[in-house]
């Protein structure tokens, strides 16, 4: 019988000796249309001195089943539940992205690799050579948990460049093109007797909205009042050419500004946001049922036709 082993830094939690219970959730989207999040939680006993810090947040956790490494995760929390008992909760690299903010911004031809690495921060990521130099145009919003996260902005980039995300066993994220071959075969022994399949209405056409952002001259007040040093002002839409009166702008981007202490007003100029619908008929012989993608704001004049073709192939 294979034994579960969990390595937390230099500490090994092994099988029946001190691993008392646990759950591992390893999930893969068959269509690669969702950035799935893996998790691990377990209860274990430790013979270490009670004053020893067992692990720190973000420390690497490696899960083995028998001799086979199954996943690399990271400590999200570790709690002492008794004199020598602990509870560990670990998350995957994609799960870490769901806890991270990303300020977004306006993109005017930056490479996909530079944007992806900026979104992932300290999480290691490899972008396949045929994707890394793809130029990206458009806008990403300010994403901050719990309502949104860096994971959402990464998903936007992947959609725009036609890529999927996988995770190596060492925890490194890998951005690569979709593969049209057979990944695996699920035989009768692995099927669920109570499973069901929903036969959805056939799609007649698909559409995507192409976005264009250009600097405009319409001014908008973004903040008026008293601020503490370092206060963060987040905009509802992208802005440029910020102007402050009564305090200074310490740091800014298209979606935000950090300001110094003072009482005054912050203004900015709006971007002109133009949209164009790109539609493609899939099947003329079915009732009208169009499937659309409207809020993918990295779909631009440069890639809108390619995105529409990929969406048509998907459906």
Place the predicted regions along the sequence by residue.
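Stable alpha-helical elements in mature extracytoplasmic
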Residues: 111-115, 149-154, 307
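Surface-exposed cap/loop segments at beta↔alpha junctions
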Residues: 2-7, 45-130, 180-184, 254, ...
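Polar/acidic, low-complexity leader/linker segments enriched in S/T/G and N/D
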Residues: 1-25
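Charged, gly/pro-rich, cysteine-poor intrinsically disordered low-complexity regions
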Residues: 195-315
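Acidic, glycine-rich low-complexity segments with interspersed aromatic residues
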Residues: 27-54
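N-terminal export/assembly leaders
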Residues: 26, 33-34, 38, 96-101, ...
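Short beta-strand-centered interaction patches in the first periplasmic/extracellular domains
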Residues: 2, 74-97, 130-215, 246-274
């Amino acid at each position: 019988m294979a034994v579960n082993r969990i390595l937390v830094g230099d500490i090994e939690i092994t099988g029946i000796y001190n691993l008392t219970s646990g759950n591992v959730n390893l999930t893969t989207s068959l269509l690669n249309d969702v950035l799935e999040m893996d998790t691990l939680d377990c209860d274990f006993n430790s013979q270490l001195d009670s004053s020893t810090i067992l692990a720190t947040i973000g420390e690497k956790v490696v899960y083995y089943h028998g001799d086979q490494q199954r996943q690399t995760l990271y400590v999200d929390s570790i709690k002492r539940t008794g004199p020598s008992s602990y509870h560990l909760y670990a998350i995957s690299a994609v799960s870490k992205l769901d806890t991270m903010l990303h300020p977004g911004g306006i993109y005017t031809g930056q490479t996909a690799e530079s944007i992806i690495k900026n979104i992932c921060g300290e999480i290691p990521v490899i972008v396949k050579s045929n994707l890394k130099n793809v130029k990206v145009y458009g806008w990403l919003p300010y994403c901050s948990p719990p309502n949104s996260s860096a994971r959402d902005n990464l998903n936007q980039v992947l959609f725009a460049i036609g890529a999927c995300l996988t995770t190596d066993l060492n925890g490194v994220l890998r951005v690569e093109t979709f593969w049209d071959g057979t990944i695996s075969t699920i035989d009768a022994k692995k099927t669920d007797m109570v499973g069901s399949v929903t036969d959805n209405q056939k799609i007649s056409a698909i559409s995507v909205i192409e976005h264009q952002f250009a600097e405009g001259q319409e001014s908008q007040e973004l903040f008026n009042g008293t601020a503490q040093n370092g206060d963060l002002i987040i905009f509802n839409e992208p802005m440029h050419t910020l102007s402050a009166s009564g305090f200074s702008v310490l740091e800014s981007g298209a979606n935000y500004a950090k300001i110094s202490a003072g009482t005054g007003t912050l203004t900015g100029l709006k971007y002109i946001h133009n949209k164009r619908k790109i539609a493609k008929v899939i099947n003329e012989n079915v009732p009208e049922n169009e499937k659309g993608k409207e809020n993918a704001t990295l779909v631009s004049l440069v890639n809108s036709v390619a995105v529409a073709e990929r969406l048509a192939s998907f459906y």
